[in-house]
Amino acid sequence: MLFPTPLISGRLERRYKRFLADVTLDDGRFITASVPNTGSMLGLTAPGSRVWLSFSDAPHRKYAHTLQIVEADNTLVGVNTGLPNRIAEEAILKGLIPDLDGYATLKREQKYGRNSRIDLLLDDGPRPRAYVEVKNVHFIRTPGLAEFPDTVTARGAKHLDELVDVVAAGHRGIMLFITQRADCSRFGISGDLDPFYARAFERAIASGVEAWAVRCHITENGIDATELVPIEDMRRIE
């Protein structure tokens, strides 16, 4: 996935009100940017961090700049939670996930469950449909181990329960974690940060929901899904 225009670099001053960040650009300008991320961005908001932003002069936008990448632990980390669905779709279409290869059709944002929309729906006539729920991952606190979630996510637990219902109806329920950073070799659920989600994940796997984790390579030009990483056994569940 390529960024449509070159990114602009700067230094993060602060993130606040969840969706805003103050940034000093490399040319000295001080700007306020939108932050397309509803999570805590734990470990990614230190003042002075190198950041990269996209720019749009569309008249309907209140803020022309959008935060896309933060440098943390000498690694570029994608923070735009609007991108993982596109990254996941590209990963599936290029055969990165063998168990999801070969479906005839791929549809986005299809209604299902309890007033929800599935991120990706794969269909192929006689084969069971595959309902793919995509989650963005950028949290690392142990070297090499990417974790989800970085804060409590009741919505995430609801999605797991809906995937269980999908499996019970004879379809495939897929949990696909897109890790927007390259410095991970494995993935795990952070049960200490959200025990309820961790237990929901455990129940979902026991009920037949499938889970995959994908690592990405991040540059100032774009984000590319590169390979699967193993998912560790449940850990730190209280």
UniProtKB/Swiss-Prot annotation:
- Which InterPro entries does this chain map to? SfsA, SfsA_C, SfsA_N
The molecular function terms of the Gene Ontology recorded here are: DNA binding
Q: Per its UniProt record, what Pfam families does this chain match?
A: SfsA (PF03749), SfsA_N (PF17746)
Q: Which Gene3D superfamilies has this protein been placed in?
A: 2.40.50.580, 3.40.1350.60
- Entry's family note: Belongs to the SfsA family.
Name the record gives this protein: Sugar fermentation stimulation protein homolog
From the broadest rank down, the organism's phylogenetic lineage runs: Bacteria, Pseudomonadati, Pseudomonadota, Alphaproteobacteria, Hyphomicrobiales
